[in-house]
Swiss-Prot record:
P domain (Extended arm): annotated segments: 277-410
Gene: Canx
Protein name: Calnexin
Residues in compartment: Cytoplasmic: 504-591
Signal peptide: 1-20
Phosphoserine: residues carrying this PTM: S553, S563, S582
Swiss-Prot/TrEMBL keywords: Acetylation, Calcium, Chaperone, Disulfide bond, Endoplasmic reticulum, Lectin, Lipoprotein, Membrane, Metal-binding, Mitochondrion, Palmitate, Phosphoprotein, Repeat, Signal, Transmembrane, Transmembrane helix, Ubl conjugation
């Protein structure tokens, strides 16, 4: 029963695709109503057939609790910004109107939450600067433990231009969280960022030059994965950064690795400078020859080379077409044109009628003075140049010599970064309602994974429980991308229709074809199938009656004798002969 409804739904989908292609709005509305009715009927039939099946278990939210040592963890389920400090700073070199960090933050549930009671930190404003930060339980020191940073982001309204990255603020004596701004020193910046069609997942760390003490930003290579979906699907995604003491790093989204590498080899610019550099004082010698080819100095221009010959010459074989109007101009003043009333000859000059095509030239091959057409000059050679040969004095492309880099250093442990003591969000966004949740910083991978399972894992399970059926997902996708209707028809409805057509449309073999399989004489084939079957049935009954009478008479005439077997075999042979002539054997075989 359910299969029939699905088939009906596929047929309706095909109808909707055709109507959508025609572009009639009223018809499209009717089709949507039909689709809703069919979907409701399918759901009713499913509910009846699955009445004995227990409903899917409802996911109940419970705030995650760290299962081990953490430097920071916050699920925001207490419902307040306790522990977080809003910035009161102003951005430098910015107009006063937009220099303030006056963007609003709130702790609230997601607008379309599947987990009642699950709250998070929400960036509420658009086109404003936002800054908020919180102290760690204790500073993180880069020694023998890995660093694992993890948090969740949901772009509830999508994202036009803005970021959702975190900054791990360096431990300094000057650090004041209420003055947190864009130039506050940080150790690591990590998280998603997007503007236009540029989708990024930042991992930046500030490396201290051991010789000069100057900090320089080092950027990880761009991930190979396509990041667009994480910004557009309006789902909660889990971002994880793992830094190991052996300088390796991993970046994960939803617990799947999207980028990995080594701090020594996969950062731009590199952590360690080159041992040698080009000598800035070196200069190319004046006689240095970088020309790989030169003109042949021994080549001589041929005596018959005419450099003055034109590239085009008149075609001497051309003749003027008959009927050419030499005395008629190609264009004439428009006789119907009149000088505008506001024409001022002192200001505008003498008025002249606009030129139009001479109507007399329309029926003639041409007008005006006839000139021979130009053709390529077969004797044209152009300016003579000597051929090019290899330069015997070629010395290659000059490069300055290499000298030892006076600023060279070698840091083989870039993992040992500046300790940090706070986490902060310093963001500008053109989109509001960005949802953050379940921040955790730890040195234990197991603790972070448990936190993810108890937080993000519940969101994922709740989303799966509330996920619509396959049919509804197809309909929702087609609403966003109308061209999918055509795909549905070609990949689903059309093959199903062809299979049904193939299976249900049997084709009878004609009697004439069946008769080709035997040499026995056969009656003429009737045009009507019904008459043939009726005649066969009647002949069969007559033959059976004759056979019964024959057997009865034979039994009365012949007594029981010692040659009983011989007598019994005779009626049997006659019976076989009659059966061979019976119309039963002439009935066509059914497929």
């Amino acid at each position: 029963m359910e299969g029939k409804w699905l088939l009906c739904l596929l047929l309706v989908l095909g109808t909707a695709a055709v109507e959508a292609h025609d572009g009639h709005d009223d018809d499209a509305i009717d089709i949507e109503d039909d689709l809703d009715d069919v979907i409701e009927e399918v759901e009713d039939s499913k509910s009846k057939s699955d009445a004995s099946t227990p409903p899917s278990p409802k996911v109940t939210y419970k705030a995650p609790v760290p299962t081990g040592e953490v430097y920071f963890a916050d699920s925001f389920d207490r419902g307040s910004l306790s522990g977080w400090i809003l910035s009161k700073a102003k951005k430098d070199d910015t107009d006063d109107e937009i220099a303030k960090y006056d963007g609003k933050w709130e702790v609230d549930e997601m607008k379309e939450t599947k987990l009642p009671g699950d709250k998070g930190l929400v960036l509420m404003s658009r086109a404003k600067h936002h800054a908020i930060s919180a102290k760690l339980n204790k500073p993180f020191l880069f020694d023998t433990k890995p660093l694992i940073v993890q948090y969740e982001v949901n772009f509830q309204n999508g994202i036009e231009c803005g970021g959702a990255y975190v900054k791990l603020l360096s431990k300094t004596a000057e650090l004041s969280l209420d003055q947190f701004h864009d130039k506050t020193p940080y150790t690591i910046m990590f998280g998603p960022d997007k503007c236009g069609e540029d989708y990024k997942l930042h991992f930046i760390f500030r490396h201290k030059n051991p010789k000069t003490g100057v900090y320089e930003e080092k950027h990880a290579k761009r991930p190979d994965a396509d990041l667009k979906t994480y910004f557009t699907d309006k789902k909660t995604h889990l971002y994880t950064l793992i830094l190991n003491p052996d300088n390796s790093f991993e970046i994960l989204v939803d617990q799947s690795v999207v980028n990995s590498g080594n701090l020594l080899n996969d950062m731009t610019p590199p952590v360690n400078p080159s041992r040698e550099i080009e000598d800035p004082e070196d200069r190319k010698p004046e006689d240095w020859d970088e020309r790989p080819k030169i003109a042949d100095p021994d080549a001589v221009k041929p005596d018959d080379w005419d450099e003055d010959a034109p590239s085009k010459i008149p075609d001497e074989e051309a003749t003027k077409p008959e009927g050419w109007l030499d005395d008629e101009p190609e264009y004439i003043p428009d006789p119907d044109a009149e000088k505008p009333e506001d024409w001022d000859e002192d200001m505008d000059g003498e008025w002249e009628a606009p030129q139009i095509a001479n109507p007399k030239c329309e029926s003639a091959p041409g007008c005006g003075v006839w000139q021979r057409p130009m053709i390529d000059n077969p004797n044209y050679k152009g300016k003579w140049k000597p051929p090019m040969i290899d330069n015997p004095n070629y010395q290659g492309i000059w490069k300055p010599r290499k000298i030892p880099n006076p600023d060279f250093f070698e840091d083989l442990e870039p993992f040992k970064m500046t300790p940090f003591s706070a986490i902060g969000l310093e963001l500008w966004s053109m989109t509001s309602d960005i949802f953050f949740d379940n921040f955790i910083i730890s040195g234990d991978r197991r603790v972070v994974d448990d936190w993810a399972n108890d937080g993000w894992g519940l969101k994922k399970a709740a989303d799966g429980a509330a996920e619509p059926g396959v049919v509804l997902q197809m309909l929702e996708a087609a609403e966003e991308r109308p061209w999918l209707w055509v795909v549905y028809i070609l990949t689903v409805a059309l093959p199903v229709f062809l299979v049904i057509l193939f299976c249900c449309s049997g084709k009878k073999q004609s009697n004439a074809m069946e008769y080709k399989k035997t040499d026995a004489p056969q009656p003429d084939v009737k045009d009507e199938e019904g008459k043939e079957e009726e005649k066969n049935k009647r002949d069969e009954e007559e033959e059976e009656e004759k056979l019964e009478e024959k057997q009865k008479s034979d039994a009365e005439e012949d007594g029981v004798t010692g040659s009983q077997d011989e007598e019994d075999s005779k009626p049997k042979a006659e019976e076989d002969e009659i059966l061979n002539r019976s119309p039963r054997n002439r009935k066509p075989r059914r497929e």
